[in-house]
Amino acid sequence: MNNKLKVLRAMRNWSQAELADRLDVSRQAVNAIETGKYDPSLPLAFKLARLFEMRIEEIFDDGEGHDDEK
């Protein structure tokens, strides 16, 4: 799953370890999410959304290219 986590983290000048501490996960978990090797659990996705004050879908993109139906 594509995500903007690395960009959002960099905008705040946080290291992976600092973000991991804020989320109560390992630095390796943050790295795996950033590189698309691991998709976060729903509770973790909500934590990320709250931390960055964004909606989950603003952070994560499933790559499906869904358009809103009109």
Predicted regions and their residues:
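Short basic helix-loop element that most often maps to the first helix and adjoining turn
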Residues: N3-R22
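Short, basic-rich loop-to-helix N-cap that marks the start of a DNA-contacting helix
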Residues: K37-K47, H66
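DNA major-groove recognition helix of helix-turn-helix/homeodomain DNA-binding modules
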Residues: P43-E58
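Recognition helix of helix-turn-helix/homeodomain-like DNA-binding domains
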Residues: V25-Y38
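Residues in the helix-turn-helix
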Residues: E18, A29, E58
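Short, charged recognition helix plus adjacent turn
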Residues: R50, F60-K70
